[in-house]
Amino acid sequence: GVCCGVSFCYPC
C-alpha cells in the first residue's frame, strides 16, 4: 500500500 500524510502515515 501507499502512505499519505506528513506527520503520520495513513493508507491512500
UniProtKB/Swiss-Prot annotation:
Molecular function in Gene Ontology: toxin activity
GO cellular component terms listed in the entry, alphabetical order: extracellular region
Keyword terms of this UniProt record: Disulfide bond, Hydroxylation, Neurotoxin, Secreted, Toxin
Protein's cellular compartments: Secreted
Tissue: Expressed by the venom duct.
Cysteines engaged in disulfide bonds, as pairs: C3-C12, C4-C9
Secreted recorded as keyword: yes
4-hydroxyproline PTM positions: P11
Top-level taxonomic group: Eukaryota
Family in the record: Belongs to the conotoxin T superfamily.
Domain remarks in the Swiss-Prot or TrEMBL record: The cysteine framework is X (CC-CX[hydroxyPro]C).
Described purpose of this protein according to its UniProt entry: Inhibits the neuronal noradrenaline transporter (NET/SLC6A2).
Protein known as: Chi-conotoxin-like Ar1248
